[in-house]
A protein has these predicted regions:
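Residues forming the flavin
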Residues: 1-321
Length: 321
């Protein structure tokens, strides 16, 4: 795909950051790059990731209108893949491949709890993007053949949970939890057995489930990382999920923290023509607050492409499958 785009005149800048932009009469004039280059343009699609905190801060300081947005936080849980297979298929057979699942629950106080980014036969990884923070994520290799299945189990948080009304308060909310996770694991991923999590007690030894984690981990107490309402929501949800998947609520289930990058805590405001308050600066995708995963981000990208194509061709264009 890269070579095709380059053959049509496109250019890729690797290891290069957009550090600034200039305007004239509130219209985009140029973007500045970390390599010192300045590119004159009147259209820039701001398709940043949901962890691009430096860019959030830069555009906020430049006067781009932004607002708080709900997202979800929680933990990664690990179970033996064989147990998931037996629950989903009725038996375990390698020819069927590693089974997956999708789970949802609503707490008594109205918060949603759900599985997210489930990784069959996968690994938990440290995905921190800032110093002295810990962020967990999941991944599977193509064979999906590790011993464990893992998934995020997260609960919804809203701007009412954030420390202030500042548009970037959700980012600070994330950052605080990620620093707590780093401290709880002494710089490693903090893990805990589900039984110990419920008893608010630091794990001292593993049970019958061994973690599949890329990188170092340390025993900890995730109650020291997450707000009480999140811990309660997850604990209740794990009991409910046992009705769907036998063994999901096993005392030896491995939990790791903190899963805090489910989606963007910020939305960059755009109008009906996809424009920010600087004309030509077009927020798009998950980091901009208009998607909640790969598929919805791709759909938003298609809408932006069709809009920009109309500008250049003066006619409607459509993406066809």
């Amino acid at each position: 795909m890269r070579k095709y785009i380059e053959s049509k005149g496109g250019t890729f800048y690797f290891d290069t950051e957009m550090t600034d932009f200039t305007t004239e009469n509130n219209v985009l004039k140029a973007v500045k790059l970390s390599n010192g280059e300045e590119i004159e343009t009147n259209i820039c699609v701001l398709a940043i990731g949901h962890s691009a905190r430096d860019t959030f801060e830069m555009i906020f300081n430049k006067g781009i209108n932004m607002e708080q947005k709900p997202f979800a936080i929680g933990v990664r849980v690990e179970h033996p893949q064989e147990k998931i297979n037996k629950s989903q298929y009725g038996f375990s057979d390698n020819r069927l491949g590693a089974a997956s699942y999708k789970l949802t629950y609503k707490t008594d106080n109205g918060r949603g709890v759900y599985s997210f980014c489930m990784c069959p036969g996968g690994f938990v990884v440290n995905a921190a993007s800032e110093k002295e923070t810990c962020v967990v994520n999941g991944m599977s290799y193509s064979k999906r053949d590790s011993r464990n299945a893992n998934s995020a189990i997260v609960t919804t948080v809203t701007p009412q949970d954030y420390p202030s009304k500042h548009p970037l308060a959700g980012v600070e909310f994330q950052r605080k939890l990620e620093r707590k996770a780093f401290a709880e694991g002494n710089g490693n991923i903090p893990i805990q057995r589900l039984e110990d999590f419920r008893n608010n007690k630091k794990t001292e030894a593993l049970g019958k489930i061994t973690p599949e984690i890329k990188g170092k981990y340390s025993f900890g107490n995730l109650n020291n990382v997450l707000p009480e309402y999140v811990c309660k929501s997850i604990s209740d949800a794990m009991e409910y999920f046992e009705r769907k998947i036998e063994g999901f609520n096993d005392n030896d289930t491995i939990m790791s923290a903190v899963e805090s990058r489910t989606s963007s805590p910020v939305r960059i405001i755009r109008d009906e023509n996809y424009q920010s308050n600087v004309r030509g600066l077009i927020p798009a995708g998950e980091g901009a607050g208009y998607a909640g995963g790969i598929t919805s981000a791709a759909i938003d990208g298609i809408k932006i492409f069709e809009f920009i194509g109309k500008i250049f061709t003066n006619r409607k264009i459509f993406v066809r499958a």
